Amino acid sequence: MSEIKKALNTLEIEDFDAIEMVDVDAMPENEALEIMGASCTTCVCTCSCCTT
């Protein structure tokens, strides 16, 4: 089994940071971009904030 599969198999829900569970579609665009640490002018992105 690959190392990544081993890591995924041992992953616990507590291992996720709260920031990873934020619903970016439910917040203002500028706040979502701030959390993601990117802007639509500097990355190729398919997120709803970049495609609307």
From Swiss-Prot:
Covalent link (Thiazole-4-carboxylic acid (Thr-Cys)) residue numbers: 42-43, 46-47
Chain residue numbers at which the record places covalent cross-link Thiazole-4-carboxylic acid (Val-Cys): 44-45
Location of O-methylthreonine modifications: 46
Propeptide residues according to the Swiss-Prot or TrEMBL record: 1-38
Key words of the record: Antibiotic, Antimicrobial, Bacteriocin, Hydroxylation, Methylation, Secreted, Thioether bond
GO BP term, example: defense response to bacterium
Description of post-translational modifications: Maturation of thiazole and oxazole containing antibiotics involves the enzymatic condensation of a Cys, Ser or Thr with the alpha-carbonyl of the preceding amino acid to form a thioether or ether bond, then dehydration to form a double bond with the alpha-amino nitrogen. Thiazoline or oxazoline ring are dehydrogenated to form thiazole or oxazole rings.
Covalent cross-link site, Pyridine-2,5-dicarboxylic acid (Ser-Cys) (with S-48): 39-47
Modified residues (1-amino-2-propanone): 52
Crosslink site: Thiazole-4-carboxylic acid (Cys-Cys): 49-50
Keyword Membrane: no
InterPro entries on file: Thiopep_bacteriocin_prcur
Thiazole-4-carboxylic acid (Ser-Cys) crosslink location in chain: 39-40, 48-49
Cross-link Pyridine-2,5-dicarboxylic acid (Ser-Ser) (with C-47), where in sequence: 39-48
Chain positions with Decarboxylated threonine modification: 52
Modified residues ((Z)-2,3-didehydrobutyrine): 42, 51
Localization annotation: Secreted
Keyword Secreted in record: yes
Family: Belongs to the thiocillin family.
Function statement: Has bacteriocidal activity against Gram-positive bacteria, but not against Gram-negative bacteria. Inhibits bacterial protein biosynthesis by acting on the elongation factor Tu (EF-Tu).
Protein name stated in the entry: Thiocillin
